[in-house]
Amino acid sequence: MATTKSVLVLIFMILATTSSTFATLGEMVTVLSTDGGGIKGIIPGIIPEFLEGQLQKMDNNADARLADYFDVIGGTSTGGLLTAMITTPNENNRPFAAAKDIVPFYFQHGPHIFNSSTGQFFGPKYDGKYLMQVLQEKLGETRVHQALTEVAISSFDIKTNKPVIFTKSNLAKSPELDAKMYDICYSTAAAPIYFPPHHFVTHTSNGATYEFNLVDGGVATVGDPALLSLSVATRLAQEDPAFSSIKSLDYKQMLLLSLGTGTNSEFDKTYTAEEAAKWGPLRWMLAIQQMTNAASSYMTDYYISTVFQARHSQNNYLRVQENALNGTTTEMDDASEANMELLVQVGETLLKKPVSKDSPETYEEALKRFAKLLSDRKKLRANKASY
């Protein structure tokens, strides 16, 4: 009798724990973030294609899209473009691009975007006209409020000297942020040196004109928007009743996938003090951009991984990054066929690499694990909504 009672108590405890685990999973906030990096966006473009393919298999749904699974999708520069592609609705209110369309987009349009050189020593390297043209064709008149999930796309206003973050959740307080997606995408991609800044206007709640003078979102996030995306997700969790159980900064109920565009920081291009002492302003400007992006990517990953580990939630954060780019693959604007093929190889090879030196798990295996969590969570939410 005592044994039977003990078994029943044990079963009850297991069921209670399982129920709690599923409840936690159902209320988990999911975040996808993609770095900036120009044509190197091909590298992270490989990752969403793999992940979306896994979700389609698990849910037996060829129409499954990443926007169906992530609460917040954010990016800067080329990552902002990727964000818009998978969250902007078509005429059927589905993402106008599947994840498998990302890499072909770069192959089709990259050579034209990075080909219209101004030929001027002073001024941007490219005129940006083709980039704006293709963004207008693809995104139409769609505005932020129409995005299929919460977005977080960064830019920097050189007139006000402040970052500008385009999100759906900010529109009630700041309706002037409800800009057209093509204006936002050009702005977040308008990297100093490469493209001209972008000027456009919207309107405030009282109808007054609101002016933007924007450059690349990497100026605001220094290339890695993961912290920004995580901040937007935290605010969403605090304001949305669906996530009422989540406390501020409770990373146990956050799932973050952060995609990098690759870095050569370990360390293809290094310098000595003797070499750098001979540099002029232009050489320093180019080197500082490279160093700053590499350092920011490392420090952002270090901070986020430390916080998740401190909360015993390290499996809820996955940073997918290639740290050993070399040759032409390090260039943001080499859109030659040969280099783009190399970038595809980098992305495909990355899937087979271990996540870290301390873990045998490959990125491919980690993404399958994330796909299972995303799939289960979506089903739990659907079941909860049906009651």
From Swiss-Prot:
Additional comment: Patatin have a dual role as a somatic storage protein and as an enzyme involved in host resistance.
Motif residue range(s): DGA/G: 216-218
Official protein name in the record: Patatin-11
Presence of the UniProt keyword Glycoprotein in the record: yes
EC number: 3.1.1.-
Location of the PNPLA domain: 32-230
Primary site of residence: other
Source organism of this protein record: Solanum tuberosum (Potato)
Motif GXSXG boundaries: 75-79
One cellular component (GO) term of this entry: vacuole
Range of residues in the leader sequence: 1-23
Motif GXGXXG positions after renumbering to this chain: 36-41
Residues annotated as the enzyme's active site: S77, D216
Glycosylation sites: N115, N326
Matching InterPro entries: Acyl_Trfase/lysoPLipase, PNPLA_dom
Keywords linked to the UniProt accession: Coiled coil, Glycoprotein, Hydrolase, Lipid degradation, Lipid metabolism, Plant defense, Signal, Storage protein, Vacuole
A Gene Ontology molecular function term of the record: nutrient reservoir activity
Protein localization: Vacuole
BP terms from Gene Ontology: defense response; lipid catabolic process
Function comment: Probable lipolytic acyl hydrolase (LAH), an activity which is thought to be involved in the response of tubers to pathogens.
Protein family according to the UniProt entry: Belongs to the patatin family.
Entry remark concerning the domains of this protein: The nitrogen atoms of the two glycine residues in the GGXR motif define the oxyanion hole, and stabilize the oxyanion that forms during the nucleophilic attack by the catalytic serine during substrate cleavage.
Coiled-coil regions listed in the entry: 322-385
Tissue: Tuber.
Top EC group: hydrolase
